[in-house]
Structures are given as C-alpha cells and as structure tokens.
C-alpha cells in the first residue's frame, strides 16, 4: 500500500524541482505557495475563493489559534478543516516565531517559552510537547516542530546556542508527535547565515528523521543577497527525497530565486496584506492602486491575468473602491495577488518539467524590469 504521506519528485532542472506531495486530503503540487490563514481565515477571502486561485494548501498559525479561539475549542468543533471549511491540506507552524516576535515578557528556558498574550496579557507556556498537542488538536496535515528563531544580525555564539536548543526541541517534538499515519512532521534547519551551523543542524535533523525539512531563520532582516547566499548551500544539506520548505518568504523575486536553489514550498502574508493596503502584484511589478494616475484608467491591472479583479474591473474602479475604503477593494486585490502568486508557481512547475526553467526565469525578470504600463 502506498504511504499516506509521501513526496514524489517528477522532474528537475538544475537545482529546481517539481513534484507532488501526496496526503490523505489531496495532492500538493510543488513548487507550492501557501496562503496564510492566520486566524483560521485568509483575510478578505472565502475558502472557495482561495481554492479558485489554485492553492493546494493553506498555512495556519498555532500561536494565534491557541490564544483565540483555542485549540481545544477547535477540536471540540470538529478540527480546523471543518471549522474554517477548508477541505485541502493545512500546514501549521509551531508558534515559536510568533512567540518571539509578538508576545510580551518572554522567558526562554530549556523546557520552552513562557510569555504573555498580545491579546489580553494572559500568561501561557509553549513547549515542544505543548506545540505538538495543539497541532494535533487542530488536525494539521503537516506539523512543524517547535523551534527558536533568533533575529538577525546575531553573533555566532547566540546563533549556535539557539540552533542547538532548537535541535534538542526537534528531538522532543519528534518524540511527542509519535506515530500518526497520514500526518507529517517537518524539522526546521537553523544556524543563521553560518554555513557550519547549518550543516550541524541538518545532520542533527536527518539523524532524528522527519517527513520534510524547512529552512528556517531566514527572511528576518538579512536582505536578499545574504538570504540567497545561504540558500546556495542550505537546501543541499537536506535529504533530497523529502520536501524542502522555506518559511516566511513571499516576494516574487525571492520565490523564484528560492525555487532555483532547490526549495519546494513557501508561505507569506505578503499577497494578502499588500492587497488590503492597495498594492497589486503584476507581471510588470507592483501597482499602487491608490495613485491618482489610475483614476481614469479603463484597463485591467494585468491584461494577461484571468482573476475576477482583472476580468471584470478597471483600474479606475479599483482605485475608486480603495480610496472609498470599500471592503470589496481588499477582496479583489487580495484575490488578484493570490492568483498571481499561484500563476508564478504554475509557470515554474511547467518550465521545470519542460527543462526550460532558465528561459522562464529570464522572461520573468525581464518583464518585471519593464515596470508598470504607461499611464493614459
């Protein structure tokens, strides 16, 4: 019998890979971009709208859901999939990053992290064991092990200490996760921008054994050049037959650069957050729909995009509803952005399978460099 969760690589082109992650809830085509459903919703989107963009999988946030409405309540109500009406796979993060970035009065120990909720100031403790329990209650298809992600820049001693703590937590996460057929546990490589620490982390994780591996600790302020420098070697240290997930990366240029370096999965709030603030991603770069140049423009955001915003509405209309603070503005621009990101992923999958990924990248970068269409 086939495994309930497995990764099938179907083609490579250079370091870039395309394939399918098989799960009981459906297939995830890779490279895959995961929209972020922070509080059991992708902001400004209905679940069926997210499905229509081409998304195979969503990301949920353990930290936010454990605080409100709580994992126990979601479990009583039938699990996260039923709660938010999403019938495809869900990956949940471990909560570690949000604890470090959002929570107040944190105390880090070998056991875990105690912190105050950013919502009401209540005290909580998050450990590898508790993180695994929360993600089990949520019913996540892909569970992330609990880790610490230090902000960059940081000195080598701090990075080493943090990475080794995360590796001990990874072992505890693996033990607490147990044997759950159909559910996957991913380990998270840490080590900052230090190649030797990345190698040490990868060796520790591989020895423990996971269903997939994430490259963590990037997109935390180091800049694209430094991130790409790390990605030139970090994914190569991870098992070739398992999915590789780059956490929290979502600018189009970053996504394409990551895939060219062997990454299979990514997530980011950028397309939805930008949509709500009047920014649309197009083949020609970012369009700020709030700008007055769009107020009399009858053309779509992108004439080659088939999303509802581009198929049915003009730039002038999108400008108007944004300036009028109408809810439909965030809905249409978020839908467009998520559709565009999924178009990028589909283009990469097709070109990798055809062996034309280098040419696809060239066209992608040249088109973006042209900038937005001239105003009327």
UniProtKB/Swiss-Prot annotation:
Keyword Transferase assigned: yes
The entry's keywords: Glycosyltransferase, Metal-binding, Queuosine biosynthesis, Transferase, tRNA processing, Zinc
Annotated substrate binding sites: 93-97, 147, 190, 217
Enzyme Commission code(s) on record: 2.4.2.29
Cofactor binding note of this UniProt entry: Binds 1 zinc ion per subunit.
Reactions that this protein is recorded to catalyse: 7-aminomethyl-7-carbaguanine + guanosine(34) in tRNA = 7-aminomethyl-7-carbaguanosine(34) in tRNA + guanine
First and last residue of the signal peptide: none
Binding residue positions for Zn(2+): 305, 307, 310, 336
Top-level taxon of the source organism: Bacteria
Pathway(s): tRNA modification; tRNA-queuosine biosynthesis
Gene3D superfamilies: Queuine tRNA-ribosyltransferase-like (3.20.20.105)
Cofactor(s) required for function per UniProt: Zn(2+)
Purpose of the protein: Catalyzes the base-exchange of a guanine (G) residue with the queuine precursor 7-aminomethyl-7-deazaguanine (PreQ1) at position 34 (anticodon wobble position) in tRNAs with GU(N) anticodons (tRNA-Asp, -Asn, -His and -Tyr). Catalysis occurs through a double-displacement mechanism. The nucleophile active site attacks the C1' of nucleotide 34 to detach the guanine base from the RNA, forming a covalent enzyme-RNA intermediate. The proton acceptor active site deprotonates the incoming PreQ1, allowing a nucleophilic attack on the C1' of the ribose to form the product.
Entries under PANTHER family matching the protein: QUEUINE TRNA-RIBOSYLTRANSFERASE
Family (UniProt): Belongs to the queuine tRNA-ribosyltransferase family.
Protein's UniProt name: Queuine tRNA-ribosyltransferase
This protein's encoding gene: tgt
């Amino acid at each position: 019998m086939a495994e309930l969760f497995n990764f099938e690589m179907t083609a490579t082109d250079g370091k870039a890979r395309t394939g399918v992650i098989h799960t009981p809830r459906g297939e995830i085509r890779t490279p895959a971009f995961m929209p972020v459903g922070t509080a059991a919703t992708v902001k400004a989107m209905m679940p069926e709208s997210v499905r229509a963009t081409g998304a195979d999988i969503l990301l949920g946030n353990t930290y936010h859901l454990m605080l409100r409405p709580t994992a126990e309540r979601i479990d009583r109500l039938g699990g996260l999939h039923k709660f938010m009406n999403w019938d495809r796979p869900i990956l949940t993060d471990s909560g570690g990053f949000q604890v470090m970035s959002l929570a107040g009065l944190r105390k880090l120990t070998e056991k875990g992290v105690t912190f105050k909720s950013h919502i009401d100031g209540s005290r909580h403790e998050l450990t590898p064991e508790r993180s695994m329990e929360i993600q089990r209650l949520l019913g996540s298809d892909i569970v992330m092990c609990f880790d610490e992600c230090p902000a960059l820049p940081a000195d080598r001693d701090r990075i080493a200490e943090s990475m080794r703590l995360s590796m001990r937590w990874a072992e505890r996460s693996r033990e607490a996760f147990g044997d759950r057929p159909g559910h996957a546990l991913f380990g998270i490589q840490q080590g900052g921008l230090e190649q030797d620490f990345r190698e040490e982390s990868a060796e520790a994780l591989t020895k423990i054994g996971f269903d997939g591996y994430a490259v963590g600790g990037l997109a935390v302020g180091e800049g694209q050049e430094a991130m790409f420098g790390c990605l030139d070697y970090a994914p190569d240290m991870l098992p070739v037959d398992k999915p590789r997930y780059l956490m929290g990366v979502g600018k189009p240029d970053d996504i394409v650069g990551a895939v060219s370096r062997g990454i299979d999965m990514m997530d980011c709030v950028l397309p939805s957050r930008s949509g709500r603030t009047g920014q649309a991603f197009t083949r020609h770069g970012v369009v700020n729909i709030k700008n007055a140049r769009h107020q009399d423009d009858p053309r779509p955001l992108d004439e080659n995009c088939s999303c509802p915003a581009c198929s049915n509405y003009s730039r002038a209309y999108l400008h108007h509803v944004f300036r009028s603070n109408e809810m439909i503005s965030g809905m249409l621009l978020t839908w467009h952005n998520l559709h565009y990101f999924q178009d990028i992923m589909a283009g990469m999958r097709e070109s990798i399978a055809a062996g034309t990924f280098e040419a696809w990248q060239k066209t992608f970068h040249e088109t973006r460099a042209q900038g937005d269409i001239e105003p009327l």
